[in-house]
Curated annotation (Swiss-Prot):
Family listed: Belongs to the GHMP kinase family. IspE subfamily.
GO MF assignments: 4-(cytidine 5'-diphospho)-2-C-methyl-D-erythritol kinase activity; ATP binding
The enzyme's E.C. designation: 2.7.1.148
Residue sites binding ATP per the record: P101, I102, G103, A104, G105, L106, A107, G108, G109, S110, S111
Enzyme class: transferase
Keyword set, alphabetical order: ATP-binding, Isoprene biosynthesis, Kinase, Nucleotide-binding, Transferase
Catalytic activity: 4-CDP-2-C-methyl-D-erythritol + ATP = 4-CDP-2-C-methyl-D-erythritol 2-phosphate + ADP + H(+)
Any GO BP: terpenoid biosynthetic process
UniProt organism field: Prochlorococcus marinus (strain MIT 9515)
UniProt-recorded name of the protein: 4-diphosphocytidyl-2-C-methyl-D-erythritol kinase
Functional note: Catalyzes the phosphorylation of the position 2 hydroxy group of 4-diphosphocytidyl-2C-methyl-D-erythritol.
Highest taxon of the lineage: Bacteria
Length: 312
């Protein structure tokens, strides 16, 4: 039996928003070529990992709507880590306290998968390096590699080509989501391809030009004239056109006092507005939370963070 130095650990698994999501082409492997800026926010799931002596992976959660079977990314990630360890007697009892809404465009499942790789690496004393964890994460989904290091990053390719963005953003964020709505990411990308494929680039040189432009200009901060900062999400035009709830959320956010910018995150349906700092976001939230609820939205207030998955 493998002797381990740690018996139980807990990690914070953060959500993300997209400050920039640009679809620039279609890859030979069927995925889309993307240019993105992804940013962690301080809305967290909490995952507890405890060693067991029977070599099984068991998952429980406070969320009754969540599948706890082999299709759950936490289970998949745990099995990948166990396989690479080559130690059949390793096992874990995992408890997920779910706070990030499911199917919301906030990548909660992807974050949980990365947190499982990082958490079990420590729990099982595997000493996997960052490159190995990134390689494992890329097998689980396009957004998962981002969460291995987290913070704010440029994400290229299908999301697996990562470059750190040395941002110092401290914006406050208000999130809105209709709890009765979820959106298929795959279907949204298919619809975008069908409607806008004529805009896709085919030359790698032009793809590199877009990447370099994003690296140089990035997510533009407020300038001296206090103009509204720029966010971009190519999928928004598809989802907003087909989903009245998303359209309403964007309208409500756009009319909030002191809103610097607003957008949809990922493939939706969660939408967000940015504010000068967390204090301003809290102030606006307190003034409007009843209005959000009356319009059928769940709402959260949070802030951008420069860290990713962390241990408690």
């Amino acid at each position: 039996m493998t002797k381990l130095s740690t018996t139980k650990i807990c990690v914070k698994s953060p959500a993300k928003i997209n400050l920039h999501l640009e679809i620039i082409g279609k890859r030979e492997d069927g995925y889309h070529e993307l240019a993105m800026i992804m940013q962690n926010i301080d809305l967290f799931d909490y995952i507890e990992f405890e060693n067991n002596q029977i070599g099984d992976i068991e998952l429980k959660s406070n969320n009754k709507d969540l599948s706890l079977k082999d299709d759950n990314l936490i289970i998949k990630a745990a099995n990948y880590v166990k396989d690479i360890s080559k130690k059949k007697d390793l096992g874990a009892n995992i408890f997920l306290k779910k706070n990030i809404p499911i199917g919301a465009g906030l990548a909660g499942g992807s974050s949980n998968a990365a947190a499982t790789i990082i958490g079990l690496n420590k729990l099982w004393d595997l000493d996997l390096d960052n490159e190995t964890m990134l390689s494992l994460s890329s097998k689980l989904g396009s957004d998962v590699p981002f969460f291995i290091n987290g913070g704010c990053q440029f994400c290229f390719g299908r999301g697996e080509i990562l470059e750190n963005y040395n941002s110092k953003f401290d914006y406050g964020v208000i999130l809105l989501k209709n709890p009765n709505i979820s959106i298929s990411t795959a279907d949204t990308y298919k619809k975008y391809s069908k409607e806008y494929c004529s805009n896709f680039l085919t030359e790698s040189e032009k793809t590199n030009d877009i990447r370099n432009d994003l690296r140089i200009n990035g997510f533009n901060d407020l300038n001296s004239s206090n103009q509204i900062i720029k966010v971009k999400n190519d999928l928004q035009i598809i989802v907003e056109k087909e989903n009245d709830s998303v359209k309403k959320a964007l309208y409500l956010l756009s009319n909030l006092q002191n809103c610097l910018s607003f957008s949809m995150s990922g493939s939706g349906p969660t939408c967000f507005a940015l504010f000068k700092d967390i204090n301003k976001a809290n102030e606006v939230f307190e003034q409007n939370h009843k209005m959000f609820n009356n319009n059928g939205f769940e709402a959260w207030v949070c802030k951008l963070i420069n860290s990713g998955i962390t241990f408690l």
